[in-house]
Swiss-Prot record:
Residues 316-321, 512-514, 714-726, 1265-1271, 1332-1351, 1408-1423 are vacuolar. GO terms for molecular function: ATP binding; ATP hydrolysis activity; ATPase-coupled monoatomic cation transmembrane transporter activity; cupric ion binding; manganese ion binding; P-type ion transporter activity; zinc ion binding. The lineage of its organism: Eukaryota, Fungi, Dikarya, Ascomycota, Saccharomycotina. The keyword Phosphoprotein applies. The gene is YPK9. Residues 1-32, 71-115, 179-273 are annotated as: Disordered. This is Vacuolar cation-transporting ATPase YPK9.
Length: 1472
């Protein structure tokens, strides 16, 4: 195994730095000109090789994006695909037409746990198909950098170029600004008094199209004709003229008659309408697109929001074969219909004709999980440029000026053709639109209007015409789930294979004259159907009510404010956020003016309110860039309002009349819409238990077929008539494969979910519960999860002057009165006073708190820091005027009035007795005049501050110490900076650094215009704030329980690595004596490793660069593996470096890190997400528990995500716990194991019940007899159903065992004992049957007697089988280690007692009594009764001990899980 050396890693590292493209966010993607098809190739490649177990999805924004963005670490080193087909004729870029090829390098990395299961499409078709994606123009080079440009300049130098070197320059947004007429409508061209103009003849089609000017004076909606080409209009006029001339020849009486009958007035218009509709048919496609000949018959599409690959094929209906199909359905009494309903691909093969995508009448869509649907194609007149409906890609080079390219947005041209007909279909509430330019279906979820970069333009709102265009293109702004009608649900239920089999069985039983049994089963089936109907309607209604939202909004339309329904909003609309009617945001929008506070807990599970600020011009440029990559950056998210979030406060800025926002996404294209889709269409889990259950049913079906054949042979020997023989043989099938068998899978799960709900744990994905029983590794966030939510301030350490030696840290101050013991902030007499005053001011002002109804809202750390000061915080402060004496334009005036802004103010709290500051001193009133919010990429925030009547402006910055030290003047850093920092972090404390400076210009205007880059540069270091984060009391105990259960525990946090290690040790998560941390060698010599692993306590001790094993001191030899007791702690930058270029690094090296790391620190949200994926690659079943928005990506990616949130059901994770500690993890695992074992036991019980009845019936069939009608009823309804339900009521066992329950239903260790049990059942029925025939009181059965089944054979087998049903349930009701002992299941004990008592009672029943006659029993002797009792007791012990003992003899199947094989190899090395 080779260590990643400098010429492996360093090459990527140095080339990366030379390009200035550090990868700060793994979910981010580079927006370059790389082919969209190459992008999709990578996407498919990832999907086939990386197990994304979640749903498709930090500071709040990035986490929300993580819901629906694919996370990849692949660099752009995939082999170039070759071109496929002559595509240049379609006006497409060659790079966009390259086929989607699979990368062998990526395939060799690791096999996916969720391989594609395309059945309709072949793998070759999917691999070679042309493709599109919701990620337009993305090349998946994961060196994308979310860090703002100026921060890149600071880190990497100003002489280097960057792919994203500036928010404006070298970005797609820049090209948007130069060609912003694309995809939008110029205000000059769309309004005003100019008459409508025709654009002239389109060179592409030969048709002339309407310009359709959208005058604000026009109040009428477009008619259909206004969207129809001019040439077709002329044909319309000819039709109308012909109609007119025809009518003129009619007699006046005829005309009067026609008028009276309301026919003459519209007959001509009907012809026109029919003629227009005729042109919408696929046959006329070339008439409108002569230069865009369709060639592709199928395509592939990657839905990034759901991390889903789908195949799309185009078809038309063959009329001849459609008639044949309907005829076959009629002649087979609907059997063909049922088959094609259950197997829809047969319908496609029967009457579907393959056609090009553009000519489809309907499309076949299959996703990678084999889910198959058929969707109709919708065609409607549109007659607008392509860029108005689909994201436009061919933007001109930024170096060109708009005047040079001479393009107009509503002029069709070669790269932006007119779209006369909009060809669409809908899949999972996503609208797919055909692009003639690419000959592919695409989506417009992330469509942008280039005019958005100009805030002065967008603030004018839309015209009525543009709104109607966009409503046609994007649909209504509503998330309305189409609820099936009662008849539809009923129809689907009745035609489900389960109920069809039930109907078949009932008909069979009716023909066989089992009327009572058939009637009862029919009644139960009807009740079950209606119960399922009500449940489905309830669930769909709840989901629809949760997703649907409607309100009235005030919108700027045609430059006038009007009130409309929120469903009429379209991208680009300007609406009023401060409208009291709006309490929940109706769409995804960008805040344009004022500020507001929102609660995003419904989306993220994060209960901390989030502040939103008005967008700037830079924000809009970045928004355009972000939409191209579907990644909403933290920078943009500070102004981004997500659909479905609650507005806590919308504060109107002084001088403005309302808080305004612009709509950017609507309906299902919004973040909420994507999340609702993920709930309605959950990704199949692929859990082995469910796959095996159907294999198991198949196995039982083989037994049924065998029984069918044996019975037929036996009936022929007995000479039964054909009708009886056929009925009896078919009855065998209904017995061996009971229709209720699949339903038993959900019994245990439903009871477990109810128990979890009682504990405050809610689940939105029930299938994940059984998976939780198989968890191998559990990952935890630190702050708020393992530790308390609130941080307590331990104290502060101020940087003090140290004479000629520079600066040093003072003593730890735990009392705020020791920080600056003065009465006024202006009272400074020494350098130390100035330093202390400035540090104190940073504590007072550098935070993101907001005041709502007198309560402070914001980040808990900020809250604790400000609470430590004992001062007061007020917004909209007007008690005291803040003067700006050096304002150039407004000398000596009060600046809030000049600037129309009143600052937030901090001042001494007069109610605080410990306050030493003077209340009325103007210097003690600090106004926060500007804030630079915290960005997760920068890991810091800043504010600009001014005192009440001083002319000085300060800037203060706080953030991670290692980040703050980089932007400070080095001379101001204390000499013991690293030593003090290491001391605190090593002991588990959280450290925040503060810095500040005086701004060079003392004007209000300068404070509002100065860039963040300038504010956060050349700062004076001020000091540290030290927080202590106490462990939650349940943390250590829970972690110990997990470790005792052999479940690996991992901490995954954004905190400092030393703090994480300290907390890990305190919590017991780290139990090894040594912890090795990595460091990156920035200047390695040739061949030297870039990453060096050192002992955190003894840096001289390192790990071997090849094996990652401890190295002995002196001779550099590897220590004995038996003596190794260590773990690894990985930092985010190292994790990024390793897994970004994972194909270049030995797999063994990466596996060693993943297997031995207990701590992952300084991890970004996307890195947490990727860690889940990397662990899943080793075949771990991964759980993740977190409490905030930072963890949303990891919660969705993990096999089992548990969110600690106040929301009852957050879409952020499958499980949401109101228990705010990690003990809920134990509950989920316990109930998961109990549910899995219960489902397993119920499934086995139903199988053995079928086997017992099958053996009984087979023996009776051999004598030409059967069980009686009421005997079947007694067994099935009074014995089996109550037992199966009561079995499922067993609660979970308190202790979690080391061994995980098996989920393999078809392994030899399950099937062999099952077959032994079946043999024992047969043996213990066969012997009494043989013996009874020798009794003197023996009554022979009547051969073929349907009504009279009284016989000793029947009675004895009925009694014996009754006990077998009961005792089998007892044998299968296993208690510990996964469920409570059977004795604690009170309901089960009662049911078993009653059942045994009833069975004993039947044995003593008088056969001449009413009940005896009903059950058709015959008398047996008392001695034989005792024999049966003793015999069934022997049967019980035989079943209890024999199958398990045989199971123990079977060799345990070797685990195929990759991580287990690696651990076994390592154990072998240790033994050697």
């Amino acid at each position: 195994m080779d260590i990643p050396s400098s010429n492996q890693i360093q090459h990527g590292q140095r080339s990366e730095r030379n390009r200035r493209m550090p990868r700060a966010s793994f979910s981010s993607t580079a927006t370059t000109s790389t082919a969209a098809t190459l992008t999709s190739a990578m996407v498919l490649d990832q999907n086939n090789s990386e197990p994304y177990a979640g749903a498709t999805f930090e500071a709040v924004p990035s986490s929300i994006v993580s819901f629906h963005h694919p996370h990849s670490f692949q660099s752009s080193n995939l082999p170039s695909p070759h071109s496929s087909g002559n595509l240049e004729q379609r006006g497409r870029r060659l790079t966009e037409s390259e086929p989607l090829v699979l990368s062998s390098a990526e395939q060799s990395r690791s096999s996916s746990r969720n391989p594609s299961h395309f059945r309709f499409f072949t793998q070759e078709q999917i691999s070679n198909a042309e493709g599109a994606s919701t990620l337009e123009n993305t090349d998946y080079d994961m060196a994308w950098d979310a860090t703002p440009a100026y921060e890149q300049d600071r880190i990497y130098g100003t002489g280097l170029s960057s792919r994203r070197s500036s928010i404006r320059s070298f970005s797609r947004a820049s090209s948007l600004s130069n060609a912003k007429s694309y995809g939008s409508f110029s205000k000059r061209g769309r309004s005003g008094s100019r008459a409508p103009q025709r654009l002239g003849e389109n060179s592409d089609t030969g048709f002339v199209y309407h310009s359709a000017t959208h005058s604000s004076s026009s109040l009428s909606r477009y008619t259909t004709r206004e969207r129809i080409p001019i040439e077709l209009e002329s044909q319309t006029d000819e039709i109308l003229e012909d109609e007119s001339s025809t009518h003129s020849l009619e007699s006046s009486d005829s005309r009067r008659s026609a008028s009276e009958n309301n026919r003459g007035s519209f007959s001509g218009h009907d012809d026109v309408h029919n003629q227009h509709s005729e042109y919408l048919k696929p046959d006329y496609h070339e008439k409108f697109y002569p230069q865009y000949a369709p060639n592709l018959h199928y395509q592939r599409f990657y839905i990034a929001e759901e991390d889903l690959v789908i195949g799309i094929a185009a078809y038309q209906t063959s009329k001849f074969w459609y008639i044949i199909y309907n005829l076959c359905c009629f002649l087979t009494f609907g059997l063909v219909y049922l088959l094609t309903r259950w197997l829809p691909h047969l319908k496609v093969k029967l009457y579907g004709v393959k056609v090009p995508l553009a000519k489809a009448e309907w499309v076949v869509i299959e996703n990678e999980f084999g889910e198959f649907v058929i969707q109709p194609i919708d065609r409607q007149w549109y007659n607008r440029p392509l860029s108005t409906v689909l994201p436009f890609e061919n933007y001109p080079n930024p170096s060109y000026e708009p005047n040079d390219i001479n393009l107009s947005h509503h002029h069709a041209n070669e790269i932006n053709p007119n779209v006369p007909i909009l060809i669409t279909f809908e899949y999972r509430y996503i609208k797919f639109i055909y692009s003639p330019l690419d000959d592919l279906f695409k989506t417009n979820n992330n469509w942008i209007d280039p005019d958005w970069v100009d805030l002065s333009t967008v603030s004018n709102g839309l015209t009525k015409g543009v709104q109607e265009d966009r409503e046609l293109a994007f649909g209504k702004n509503q998330i309305n789930l189409r609820m099936k009608t009662t008849s539809e649900i009923l129809f689907n239920e009745v035609l489900h294979p389960f109920y069809v089999f039930q109907v078949f069985s009932i008909i069979l039983w009716g023909i066989d004259e089992y009327y009572y049994y058939a009637a009862c089963i029919f009644l139960i089936s009807v009740l079950s159907i209606f119960d399922s109907l009500n449940e489905q309607k309830k669930v769909s209604r709840n989901l629809a009510e949760m997703s649907h939202f409607h309100c009235d909004v005030r919108v700027l339309r045609d430059k006038f404010w009007t009130t409309i329904s929120s469903s009429e909003l379209v991208p680009g609309d300007i609406y009023e956020v401060s409208d009291p009617n709006i309490t929940i945001l109706p769409c995804d929008s960008i805040l344009l003016s004022s500020d507001c506070i929102v609660n995003e807990s419904m989306l993220t599970g994060e209960s901390v309110p989030v502040s939103k600020f008005p967008a700037t011009e830079e924000t809009m440029y970045q928004l355009c860039d972000d939409f191209q990559s579907t990644q909403i950056s933290s920078f943009v998210s500070k102004s981004f309002l997500y659909n479905g979030t609650n507005i806590i406060r919308a504060r109107i800025a002084p001088g403005q009349t309302a808080a305004l926002a612009m709509v950017v996404r609507t309906g299902f294209s919004t973040t909420k819409g994507s999340l609702v889709r993920s709930m309605v269409f959950p990704k199949p889990t692929g859990f082995k238990f469910y796959r095996d259950s159907f294999k198991y049913i198949g196995f039982m079906s083989l037994i049924a077929i065998f029984g069918f054949c044996v019975s037929c042979v036996q009936f022929i020997k007995l000479g039964l008539d054909k009708k009886t023989m056929i009925l009896r043989a078919l009855d065998i099938i209904t017995i061996v494969v009971p229709p209720a068998l699949p339903a038993t899978l959900t019994i245990g799960t439903n009871f477990a979910l109810s128990r979890l709900k009682e504990k405050g744990i809610f689940c939105i994905s029930p299938t994940r519960l059984n998976i939780s029983g198989k968890i191998d590794v559990m990952c935890f966030d630190k702050t708020g999860t393992l530790t308390e939510d609130g941080l307590d301030v331990l104290g502060v350490q101020i940087s003090e002057p140290n004479g000629v030696r520079g600066q040093k840290f003072g003593e730890l101050l735990s009392d705020i009165r020791q920080v600056f013991p003065k009465f006024s902030l202006n009272d400074c007499s020494s350098p130390l006073d100035f330093k202390s005053r400035n540090f104190f001011m940073s504590l007072l002002t550098c935070h993101s708190l907001r005041s709502v109804d007198g309560n402070l809202l914001g980040d808990p750390l900020d809250f604790k820091m400000f609470q430590f000061t004992g001062w007061s915080f007020e917004e909209d402060f007007q008690k005291r005027a803040f003067h700006s004496l050096y304002e150039g334009r407004h000398e000596d005036d009060v600046f809030p009035e000049n600037s129309e802004i009143i600052p937030a103010v901090v001042h001494p709290d007069s109610n605080n007795r410990e306050n030493t500051f003077t209340d009325n001193d103007p210097h003690n009133f600090l106004g926060v005049v500007r804030s630079f919010e915290f960005l997760s990429e920068l890991r810091r925030m800043s504010v600009i501050v001014k005192t009440n009547n001083d002319d000085v402006y300060w800037s203060f910055t706080k953030g991670a110490p290692e980040v703050i030290s980089e932007i400070c003047n080095k001379s101001t850093l204390p000499a013991d900076f690293e030593e003090v920092l290491r001391c605190y972090t090593h002991n588990g404390y959280r450290v925040i650094a503060c810095a500040g400076k005086t701004l060079p210009k003392r004007t209000w205007l300068y404070s509002q215009k100065v860039s963040r880059e300038e504010v956060e540069s050349n700062l004076e270091f001020l000091g540290f704030i030290i927080f202590q984060n106490k462990l939650k009391k349940e943390t250590s105990e829970t972690l110990k329980s997990l470790q005792d259960a052999n479940i690996r525990t991992i901490m995954c946090t954004g905190d400092n690595i030393l703090t994480a290690i300290s907390v890990g040790r305190e919590a017991g998560l780290i139990q090894c004596s040594r912890v090795y941390v990595p460091s990156i060698n920035d200047t390695p010599l040739h061949g030297e490793p870039v990453i060096v692993w050192r002992d955190v306590n003894e840096p001289d001790k390192i790990l071997d660069t090849k094996t990652l094993k401890p190295v002995k001191l002196g001779n550099n030899s590897v220590e004995s593996l038996r003596e190794c007791n260590y773990t690894l702690a990985v930092s985010g930058d190292v994790f990024r470096l390793l897994f970004r270029d994972e194909n270049e690094i030995p797999e063994e090296y990466l596996n060693e890190i993943l297997l031995n790391s207990s701590i992952y620190a300084r991890m970004s949200p996307d890195e947490k997400h990727e860690l889940m994926i990397q662990l899943q690659k080793l075949d771990y079943t991964v759980g993740f528990c977190g409490d905030g928005a930072n963890d949303c990506g990891a919660l969705k990616a993990a096999d089992v995500g548990i969110s600690l949130s106040e929301a009852e059901a957050s879409v952020a994770a499958p499980f949401t716990s109101k228990i705010f500690n990690i003990s809920c993890v134990l509950d989920v695992i316990r109930e998961g194991r109990a549910a899995l074992v219960t489902s397993f036991a119920c499934f086995q019980y139903m199988s053995l019940y079928s086997a017992i009845q099958f053996i009984t019936i087979t023996i009776l069939y051999s004598r030409g007899s059967n069980l009686g009608d009421f005997q079947f009823l007694y067994i099935d309804l009074l014995l089996i159903v109550p037992i199966a339900i009561c079995m499922s009521w067993s609660k979970s066992y308190e202790k979690i065992d080391k061994k995980r329950p098996s989920a393999n239903l078809v392994s030899p260790k399950i099937l062999v004992p099952l077959l032994i049990s079946v043999f024992l059942v047969f043996l213990f029925q066969f012997i009494p049957w043989i013996i009874v025939q020798k009794m003197s009181w023996y009554i022979k059965p009547i051969v073929g007697g349907d009504d009279a089944v009284q016989s000793s054979d029947n009675t004895v087998l009925f009694f014996v089988s009754n006990f077998q049903y009961i005792l089998t349930a007892i044998v299968l009701s296993v208690g510990p280690p996964y469920r409570e002992p059977m004795s604690k299941n009170f309901e089960f004990i009662v049911d078993i007692t009653v059942s045994i008592g009833a069975s004993l009672l039947l044995m003593t029943l008088d056969t001449e009594s009413y009940l005896g006659k009903m059950l058709q029993l015959t008398p047996i002797s008392n001695s034989f009764t005792m024999f049966i009792i003793v015999w069934v007791i022997l049967n019980y012990y035989a079943q209890l001990y024999i199958p398990p003992s045989i199971k123990g003899w079977l060799k345990k199947k070797k685990s195929s899980k990759k991580y287990k094989l690696l651990i076994q190899e390592e154990m072998k090395l240790k033994e050697v």
